[in-house]
Amino acid sequence: MARSAGFLLSITSLPSPYGIGTIGKEARKFADFLKKSGQTIWQILPVGPTSYGDSPYQSFSTYAGNPYLIDLDTLCEEGLLTKEEVMSRDWGSDDAEVDYEKIYNNRFEVLKIAYDNFKKGDQKAFTSFKRKNSSWLKNYALYMAVKKSFDMVSWTEWPDEEIKMRDEAAVKRYERKLKDDVDFWKFVQFKFYEQWESFRAYVNGLGIKILGDMPIYVAMDSADTWANPELFQLYDDGDPIAVAGCPPDYFSATGQLWGNPLYDWDYLEATDYEWWFERIKAASKLYDITRIDHFRAFASYYSIPYPAENAINGEWVEGPRIKFFNMMEEALGKIDIVAEDLGTLTPDVTELMEQTGYPGMKVLEFAFDSGEENDYLPHKYTENCVVYTGTHDNDTVMGWLETAKPEDVNYARSYCQMPDDEPFNWGLIRVAYESKADTAIVPMQDILGLGKEARMNIPSTLGGNWVWRLDGAALTDELADKLKTMSEKSGRLED
């Protein structure tokens, strides 16, 4: 595998006059900056529609795209919106942070205007899109329309028992009753995928690959669980039997209770993992490389009986292991996958990583707190891995510098052989690029030397996450030249 490098930046973090980044011209500008910097990978966060808490890892659908990412300027150019209709809205006043409440209150109203105008024109491409994507689109659009009619509560709380349990007659009744709204949600997906195709073609045309992110679990509040309850460990009334999380560890005495429903792997195996393979196939239409979050759950997953207040009483249960990936390769051919294998790795996870041959992840921020034996130190790497300075779940490098123990910071400086005049973030970036890892990825916050105010997410907290936005003025030619030189010196520049 050729040595390569790239940046991690959520699309939501791009500059935009409409409060949140989109797949419009600023996304193309950022791709141009990657090219100028000698990078060949743009890693992004999941792009599904987000729910309460705004986490891209809790989505209403594993297939649908986030309506927030649709570029409104493009809709104006198509005559579906006027500039005035877009600019008269309050998208938030802070260019450094996304105001999700304001986005939520305005974005769908504006998209509804676009939809009403769209209905007057040619529907041919839309009809074709609906037909090609009906396997997931019908369920998703109806789910969102019914959800909206019930004040956006999850399907497990819908007051109409018949539609909650997907009674056939009730499904038909709601499809008729909410027809226009159902079609609106289909239109939104049509525009997302139309724009995504154009965005991806532009990025790929520059020789840059999109490294996308797939959460392993689906949200309880999703079209997936509502439409396919048999795939999950659910009771007949829709309540989960057990939910996902992580056991207590050094960082948390009570563990992490994520609350996602767990897969019924016996059922999935009996159906030749068809749902999963369709999901992975759909991801490869969006991305060139797919990172699978919490990969270890394919070896064994943590099961917490429902309901629970914390993760203390869970147990490890065997996952589908290598059989799943062998069958996947038979069904889909070779798919480029990065396995998120962070945390404590048990022998079954190590074995699965070796069997699949997927590159795992190494994070430099984890490397300097336990001396020479730490597996995240670069001299321990093999070529077949992706090295990061940090991820969306960690503090920025400069934020880490402020809070780390002095002895850990001193060890990092000494190990990385940082001269006194080298800024700490650049020392870590240099070491990542010079490491033997095939791929090096750096979050934009670390390239810009930003502190904890630019951290993307603090796990197990609600509010104030996923809001950081990039200042476009920071992407200078001087910075691009510096990064390109670093790529060249470390053998990561494409010929």
Predicted regions and their residues:
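Alpha-amylase-like alpha-glycosidases and glucanotransferases acting on alpha-linked glucans and related
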Residues: 2, 10, 16, 54-193, ...
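Conserved, well-ordered alpha-helix/loop/beta-strand core segments that scaffold catalytic motifs
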Residues: 185-218
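Mature N-terminal, pre-catalytic/accessory segment of carbohydrate-active enzymes
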Residues: 1-25, 29-32, 36-37
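Catalytic domains of carbohydrate-active enzymes, especially glycoside hydrolases
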Residues: 26-50, 286-287
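Short alpha-helical segments and helix-capping/turn motifs at coil-helix boundaries
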Residues: 25-32, 194-202, 277-278, 424-428
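Surface-exposed amphipathic alpha-helices with a cationic face
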Residues: 35, 196-204, 329, 353-354
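Outer-envelope exported proteins of Gram-negative bacteria
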Residues: 45, 209-211, 215, 289, ...
